[in-house]
């Protein structure tokens, strides 16, 4: 890995009397840095969607070519989440995230000066690859600075960064068009968002923090022994800091059944989510005979209902469920099953919109809770690798099932075939939520036993 991305040497130790105050200040800065950084990734990702009408008009690209460009980015992003998140385990989170933003900005500048389809395709693939550098550092930072009892709320706050980022792309690009004019559509669509992303990258470098130990503070496990993840693994003679990213992935993720359970939870969540997002507009227009305006309202409710529900879910999983994430995820998926039937069978505009909003409100909750659980089933130094497996599985398999396989089912069996596919996915998701919950309870028991044994040894030494 490039030297500039590595974690670097530990800072001078913070005096004991200043540890609590410094810790509190640094963790807020760390959270803000990954919130703003991940938000910025969406500015240089979703701007491509806003540029597609001009790709068709100005560059004479066909709908098939534009669809191929979108697919290239999706596939590249899915692969990148797997690889880049694993590499992030061995890097400085703030430098890794900022570097990815700058690389995305450079690619967008290239898009601003390109006109050939194949150059566009290559740059879009590179953008997808560099986009994967954002999520790993985010989860690593949260795992390093926040205990399990707070991760539901903290993770929920971070999770809405993509809603905020996706929401401010249009105003940024719109303002650029107003100032530059439509004749400079490439500058407005790509170069201006790239400049904004570079500014955010600088903010990440200034605000961001490494692990507590790298900032001269005790680690989270030292300050709160109950945070230590106890795993039964083989061939772990090497210290984690002396292991490569691949060795960490193989030892702590690939052989970890809980990492696979939570990844499969995400696969089926993404299947339902992408099945709804990709096919909701055409289903409402062709089957329910909605107008375009009515369809847009239903789609708007589906997307924006996620923000309050995510924040509430974070609070509930911390407070009501005491840090156990999967029971709430199972409840949400069961409710989605019922609402999906209502959405499918209802004829009323109001009822279809309500059911679509409820599904949108709930579908992001299991996805978010799976991301929080990922931080709790592996040691902090392997979080990026676990996030990488989950990201790869969800995009390459989950999104494909919800888009391509749904389309095949509709062509072969009609719309009811597509809905049966989604309902089957919900049942599978609930099954893996249950298995993941059992695994989390097992880890919790191991943690408590380890703490009990440690207390017994300390008591024996004292005597």
UniProtKB/Swiss-Prot annotation:
UniProt keyword Membrane present: yes
Primary subcellular site in the record, as a coarse category: membrane
Keyword tags: Cell inner membrane, Cell membrane, Membrane, Transmembrane, Transmembrane helix, Transport
Disulfide-bonded cysteines: none
Subcellular location: Cell inner membrane
Keyword match Chloroplast: no
Induction: By extracellular phosphoglycerate.
Example GO biological process: phosphate ion transmembrane transport
GO cellular component labels: plasma membrane
This protein's name: Phosphoglycerate transporter protein
Organism: Salmonella typhimurium (strain LT2 / SGSC1412 / ATCC 700720)
Gene: pgtP
